[in-house]
Amino acid sequence: IFVGTVRDDGIEAMEFESFDEVAIKDLETIAEQATEQFSLNSIDIIHRNGLLKVEDTILVIVVGAVHRPEAFEGCRFILEEIKRYVPIWKKDIHTRGEEHWHH
């Protein structure tokens, strides 16, 4: 299980937006790749959109596998692939009032 949260590193909040139609297809593709590559039995991925404050949960990845190494490696693969190409953008809202959008 991986749970990603909004960190308190000068950020007051983060806002997430996604191109849902493409993001869902991309997440399904990533799950299929991870299942094949790491022999995973089950995968659940939840990524939130909208305004999230410090310590709020952004992303949850739950994988099931017969062996721990495959589960951990599969979970990491899923996380890195989400960050690499799923169309989800985030806006950092800094405590100083600055705001920055990025992928």
Residue spans for each PLM region:
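N-terminal, polar/charged subdomain of small-to-medium soluble alpha/beta proteins
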Residues: I1-T57, G64-H103
